[in-house]
């Protein structure tokens, strides 16, 4: 796939991701329309700011940009935030990083994902991206 060629994309406003303890996180996903038949790499952004309203304007510029270039882009509301269940206990907690690592592995296992998963972000999302990378998840 040429990453310079723009492709048609779909947006899924609320994709549930169920953590190992049963807590459901909510994700908004943008991906090429043919990702099911031609799996693509995934880019995860894992934030405490509500995807429904808090970061919508920015998300709707950033994530479709990458999706149109052949990536699945996933914007997750962290545990206890936005449309996700649970309680957020602290910044950069073990629970937050466990959830992010679980999400990386969950994404890699989806039929529309090639198995390659990266994270991105600025500020909070940049910090937790580095912290998850330090854990060296499989994908």
Feature annotation, model-predicted:
Residues 22, 100, 132-133:
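Hydrophobic alpha-helical segments that mediate membrane insertion or helix-helix packing
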Residues 26, 42-43, 72-73, 115-118, ...:
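Beta-sheet entry/capping signal
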Residues 27-30, 45-46, 76, 120-122:
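Generic beta-strand/beta-sheet core signal
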Residues 34-108:
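Cap/lid segment of the alpha/beta-hydrolase catalytic domain
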Residues 1-38:
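N-terminal cap/lid segment of alpha/beta-hydrolase-fold proteins
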Residues 22, 80, 121, 125:
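Conserved G/P- and acidic residue-centered "switch" motifs that form tight phosphate/ATP-binding loops
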Residues 105-139:
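Primarily recognizes the serine-hydrolase "nucleophile elbow" in alpha/beta-hydrolase
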């Amino acid at each position: 796939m040429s990453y310079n060629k723009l492709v048609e994309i779909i947006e899924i406003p609320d994709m549930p991701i169920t953590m190992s303890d049963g807590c459901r996180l909510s994700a908004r996903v943008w991906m090429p329309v043919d990702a099911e038949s031609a799996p693509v790499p995934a880019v995860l952004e894992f934030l405490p700011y509500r995807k429904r309203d808090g970061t919508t304007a920015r998300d709707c510029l950033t994530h479709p940009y990458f999706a149109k270039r052949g990536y699945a882009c996933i914007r997750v509301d962290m545990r206890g935030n936005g449309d996700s269940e649970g309680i957020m206990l602290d910044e950069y907690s073990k629970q937050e990083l466990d959830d992010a690592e679980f999400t990386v592995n969950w994404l890699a296992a989806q039929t529309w994902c090639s198995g390659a998963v990266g994270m991105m972000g600025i500020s909070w999302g940049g910090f937790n991206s580095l912290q998850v990378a330090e854990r060296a998840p499989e994908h």
